[in-house]
């Protein structure tokens, strides 16, 4: 072994001066830095000689068969893998992620790279006498793990998680960070990508998100292509590396985004806010985790209540919202959510393009479920009587309709008023469900055969409440907030209340007239439309339209001081949340009056997010041209007070925000350049990020910037003090007889959130209180071990739980996983066999149509992408009844299968209705057929 290693050492010393521009070599720090850090993975190097490396360099990538140069060979003992680098598909990195083989050598330069340590390794270090170090995860030493193929563990032992050390909870920047702050790395422009670079730098300087990827990088696991979360993890690791590279190239992340969203292909300039939404949507989709919830069945319930209220008093409590629909419209203008299924599957059951809008609705529905349960459980909703009116008289005639839905307003649920005060139906908080470890095991009767029908979330009895799928991710934890809007009919005084989840606020920039209305509406009882900036930008008639355009053009060319008072961010917020009269062409359809009525719409925030993203609507796209509103909007660097926009019954404690970063656009609507100003969290200084250039700037420079997107973070000195107190306790390390396991994700919240919420250990526990089998292989990435005194302090301060002293693989989940895996395999094999037989038929007599929406759910289940089987077959969206016959709806999203395949799926899942297509039968006259045969014979004879 020593001799073989000597070959590599001598060879490496010869070729080290040869340095090529390779993707992985961009990550290689200087040589002295590498020598100062010992790599604990050198003991895994197998025996290899110079001749072996030369022979491998003449070969090809074992996956894509591309030839060198710059192939990478795995150095793991008994592994002969050779893969391509980042100049191609980067199969070498994929191999390392899948096998946890960390050491690889470039067969052209013979330089060695360790994926786990994220640094260059010199093999002559292994020849020394220094003992090997145990592998301990450092705070910023990230290990890129991918999702392994699902295998049921054969044993019930778990790796012992690490004990939390002082660095795990320390939030103070050390002296080295203050002198040479990390995170000051630029991003190279790779073809009009300044919009992406500015957006990435703004997100990179959001500590809750970046710290999640740096400290919980092992949780960036997904089997969904193109694995944006892994590319983002890699980028954050490079940007915040202690070696402080001058700039990096975000090629992998950009290629992944372009694969999913065609908008960003090519080299044209794009919108930074659109890129932000697309990126965060993809990260949520890949990182989301399911949390089981219990919900009333039926889903749509209406409550009858009376409201005889003083209208003026109602106006006092609610300012109007031109509306929450502003953000809806902005979102729709920028395109639908961008998701994609894995296009590289070896077996596509039915070739069909993924319906991105449906997937968008699915996620919006998931996020809706997240916020519904959080809002209702904490009692902040409670029909919001006080927020609507302080004088409410109840009788049995009038109605308050409570709606809860997502931003797209696609999924609406009306809630019983008596349910709103029934906490046992919903969990006590979003992150903690006290029944997760106390619930009885799921039914073991999980499809023992093909005969019994299986229905999703099937209840044992009609009276049982059904389980509803709820999802959360680090994205929703950080950026999701809730708006409560209310529409009051001015005829019958009926009030309809709606909860909407938002990830950013798209604020209008009020003009001079709008500012005058906002500032003059100091009397809250007057019903005045005082913030409908949309009206100012949508005049009726061509003459007014042209004059408005000329006016805005002149305004954009003349300094803002010439036109009147300075517009502040508070003005934009007031315009967004202002009272909105619904009249004229915009009358309210009252469900009680059954007519169009005049109404008033109010809007306030029920829950503020940890990081508030504010988008200023500077770009307006007219019929034939686009314009940019260049009005300067002043914004505070610290102390943004959002108390005036908070709902009265909101449980929010912290409503003050400090600025983290701001994205600016210089230029016109058709061309321009994006930069970002960001505050470094380690030294609290402001920097300008202009592609690969990073420059320190003053606070006044930031305040004078033309803001387009702003990121604000909740400010809490109390949270800072609490973190320091816990860090000091951890540094003392009192001896204790018991050790407690705690979620890494929650610890990240504790370190970076102003309001971390109750402790939640449910991300590594199943509903039975054990570790799910699929998480057993990487449990050390999910938990840390705390001494008893630290746990006691955290638990007494934040509550939650459950307390965990012992980790074990859940036997019940293991049995269920084996059953469900067997079911997947059987259903998939039978479908493939039946579908192949169907494809061989030349002219089938009948076709059975099936909803592609349902089929995609079933396909995700049998391929292991979704843990739950779909519900009954639902063909109602593709079927239409004419003259008593069920026919295929024109343009329906449907697929064609054989009768045998339909019977197979229907026998398992049930549902319907049957939609049958019968190809028309062409009757041929025998005389004509005989004449054609005669002509054919004569032709052949010639």
From Swiss-Prot:
Assigned EC number: 3.4.19.12
Binding site for Zn(2+) 3: 74, 79, 95, 101
GO MF, any single term: small GTPase binding
InterPro entries (alphabetical): DUSP-like_sf, Papain-like_cys_pep_sf, Pept_C19_DUSP, Peptidase_C19_UCH, Ub_carboxyl-term_hydrolase, USP_CS, USP_dom, Znf_RING/FYVE/PHD
CC per GO annotation: centrosome; cytoplasm; cytosol; focal adhesion; Golgi apparatus; neuronal cell body; nucleoplasm; perinuclear region of cytoplasm
Keyword set, alphabetical order: Cytoplasm, Cytoskeleton, Endocytosis, Golgi apparatus, Hydrolase, Metal-binding, Phosphoprotein, Protease, Repeat, Thiol protease, Ubl conjugation, Ubl conjugation pathway, Zinc, Zinc-finger
Zinc finger region(s), UBP-type: 37-140
UniProt binding sites for Zn(2+) 1: 39, 41, 114, 117
Subcellular location, record wording: Cytoplasm, Perinuclear region; Cytoplasm, Cytoskeleton, Microtubule organizing center, Centrosome
SMART domains: DUSP, ZnF_UBP
Enzyme class: hydrolase
Residues engaged in binding Zn(2+) 2: 61, 64, 84, 91
Domain named USP: residues: 185-715
Tissue: Widely expressed.
BP terms from Gene Ontology: axon guidance; cell migration; cellular response to starvation; centrosome duplication; endocytosis; negative regulation of protein binding; nervous system development; positive regulation of protein binding
PTM-bearing positions, type Phosphoserine: 377, 439
Active site, UniProt feature: 194, 673
Pfam families: DUSP, UCH, zf-UBP
Compositional bias ranges of the Basic residues kind: 453-469
Function field: Deubiquitinating enzyme involved in various processes such as centrosome duplication, cellular migration and beta-2 adrenergic receptor/ADRB2 recycling. Involved in regulation of centrosome duplication by mediating deubiquitination of CCP110 in S and G2/M phase, leading to stabilize CCP110 during the period which centrioles duplicate and elongate. Involved in cell migration via its interaction with intracellular domain of ROBO1, leading to regulate the Slit signaling.
Record comment regarding domains: The UBP-type zinc finger binds 3 zinc ions. However, it does not bind ubiquitin, probably because the conserved Arg in position 86 is replaced by a Glu residue.
Subunit structure: Interacts with VHL, leading to its ubiquitination and subsequent degradation. Interacts with ARRB1 and ARRB2. Interacts with ADRB2. Interacts with DIO2. Interacts with ROBO1. Interacts with SELENBP1; in a selenium-dependent manner. Interacts with CCP110.
Stated family: Belongs to the peptidase C19 family. USP20/USP33 subfamily.
Protein name, entry field: Ubiquitin carboxyl-terminal hydrolase 33
UniProt organism field: Homo sapiens
Higher taxonomy: Eukaryota, Metazoa, Chordata, Craniata, Vertebrata
């Amino acid at each position: 072994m020593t001799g073989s290693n000597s070959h590599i050492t001598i060879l490496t010393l010869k070729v080290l001066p040869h340095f090529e521009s390779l993707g992985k070599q961009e990550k290689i720090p200087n040589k002295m830095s590498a020598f100062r850090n010992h790599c604990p993975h050198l003991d895994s190097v197998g025996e290899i000689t110079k001749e072996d490396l030369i022979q491998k360099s003449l070969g090809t990538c074992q996956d894509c068969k591309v030839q060198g140069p710059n192939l990478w060979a795995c150095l793991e003992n008994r592994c002969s893998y050779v893969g391509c680098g980042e100049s191609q598909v980067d199969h070498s990195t994929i191999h390392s992620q899948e096998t946890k083989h960390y050491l690889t050598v470039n067969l052209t330069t013979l330089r060695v790279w360790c994926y786990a340590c994220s640094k260059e390794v010199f093999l002559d270090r292994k020849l020394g006498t220094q003992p090997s170090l145990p592998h301990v995860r450092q705070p910023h030493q990230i290990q890129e793990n991918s999702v392994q193929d699902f295998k049921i563990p054969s044993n019930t032992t778990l790796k012992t998680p690490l004990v939390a050390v002082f660095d795990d909870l320390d939030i103070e920047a050390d002296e080295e960070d203050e002198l040479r702050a990390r995170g000051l790395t630029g991003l190279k422009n790779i073809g009009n990508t300044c919009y992406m670079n500015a957006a990435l730098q703004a997100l990179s300087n959001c500590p809750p998100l970046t710290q999640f990827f740096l400290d919980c990088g092992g949780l960036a696991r997904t089997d969904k292509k193109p694995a944006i979360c892994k590319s983002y993890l890699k980028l954050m690791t490079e940007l915040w590396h202690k070696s402080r590279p001058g700039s990096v190239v975000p090629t992998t992340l950009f290629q992944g985004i372009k694969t999913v969203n065609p908008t960003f292909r090519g080299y044209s300039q794009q919108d930074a806010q659109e890129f932000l939404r697309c990126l965060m949507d993809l990260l949520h989709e890949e990182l989301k985790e399911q949390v089981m919830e219990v919900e009333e069945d039926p889903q749509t319930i209406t409550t009858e209540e009376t409201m005889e209220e003083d209208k003026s008093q109602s106006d006092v409590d609610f300012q109007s919202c031109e509306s929450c629909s502003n953000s809806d419209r902005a979102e729709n203008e920028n395109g639908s959510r961008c998701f994609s299924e894995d296009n590289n599957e070896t077996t596509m059951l039915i070739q069909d393009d993924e319906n991105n809008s449906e997937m968008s609705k699915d996620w919006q529905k998931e996020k809706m479920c997240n916020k519904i349960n959080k809002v209702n459980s904490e009692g902040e909703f409670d029909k919001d009587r006080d927020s609507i009116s302080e004088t409410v008289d109840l009788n049995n005639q009038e109605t308050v309709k409570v709606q809860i839905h997502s931003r797209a307003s696609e999924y609406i649920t009306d809630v019983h008023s008596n349910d709103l005060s029934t906490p046992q139906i919903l969990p006590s908080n979003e992150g903690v469900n006290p029944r997760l470890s106390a619930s009885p095991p799921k039914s073991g009767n999980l499809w023992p055969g093909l005969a019994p029908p299986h229905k999703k979330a099937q209840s044992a009895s009609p009276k049982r409440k059904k389980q509803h799928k709820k999802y959360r991710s680090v994205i929703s934890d950080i950026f999701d907030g809730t708006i409560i809007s209310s529409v009051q009919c001015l005829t019958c005084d009926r009030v309809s209340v709606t909860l909407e989840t938002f990830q950013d606020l798209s604020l209008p920039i009020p003009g001079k007239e709008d500012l005058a209305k906002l500032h003059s509406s100091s009397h809250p009882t007057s019903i005045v439309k005082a913030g409908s900036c949309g009206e100012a930008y949508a005049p009726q008639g061509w003459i007014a339209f042209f004059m408005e355009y000329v006016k805005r053009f002149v305004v954009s060319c003349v300094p803002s001081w010439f036109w009147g008072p300075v517009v502040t961010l508070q003005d934009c917020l007031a315009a967004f949340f202002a009272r909105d009269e619904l009249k004229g062409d915009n009358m309210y359809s009252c469900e009680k009056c059954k007519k169009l009525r005049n109404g008033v719409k109010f809007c306030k925030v029920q829950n503020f997010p940890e990081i508030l993203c504010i988008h200023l609507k500077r770009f307006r796209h007219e019929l034939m041209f686009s314009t940019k509103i260049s009005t300067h909007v002043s914004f505070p660097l610290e102390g943004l007070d959002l108390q005036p926009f908070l709902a009265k019954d909101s449980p929010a404690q912290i409503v003050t925000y400090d600025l983290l970063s701001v994205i600016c656009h210089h230029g016109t609507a058709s061309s321009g350049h994006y930069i970002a100003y960001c505050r470094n969290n380690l030294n609290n200084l402001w920097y300008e990020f202009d592609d690969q250039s990073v420059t320190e700037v003053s606070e006044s420079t930031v305040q004078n910037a033309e803001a387009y997107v702003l990121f604000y973070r909740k400010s809490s000195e109390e949270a800072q003090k609490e973190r320091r107190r816990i860090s000091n306790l951890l540094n003392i390390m009192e001896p204790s007889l018991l050790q407690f396991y705690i979620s890494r994700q929650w610890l990240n919240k504790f370190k970076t959130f102003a309001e971390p919420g109750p402790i939640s250990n449910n991300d590594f526990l199943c509903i039975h209180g054990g570790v799910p089998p699929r998480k057993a292989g990487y449990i050390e990435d999910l938990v840390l071990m705390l001494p008893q005194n630290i746990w006691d302090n955290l638990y007494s301060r934040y509550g939650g739980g459950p307390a965990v002293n012992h980790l074990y693989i859940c036997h019940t989940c293991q049995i269920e996983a084996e059953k469900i895996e067997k079911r997947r395999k059987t259903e998939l094999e039978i479908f493939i066999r039946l579908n192949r037989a169907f494809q061989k038929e030349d002219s089938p007599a009948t076709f059975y149509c099936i909803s592609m929406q349902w089929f995609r759910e079933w396909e995700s289940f049998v391929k292991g992408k979704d843990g739950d089987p779909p519900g009954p077959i639902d063909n109602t969206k593709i079927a239409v009844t004419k003259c008593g016959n069920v026919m295929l709806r024109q343009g329906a999203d449907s697929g064609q299968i054989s009768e045998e395949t339909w019977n197979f799926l229907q026998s398992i899942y049930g549902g319907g209705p049957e939609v049958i297509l019968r190809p028309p039968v062409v009757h041929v006259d025998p005389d004509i057929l005989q004449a054609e045969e005669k002509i054919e014979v004569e032709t052949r004879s010639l």
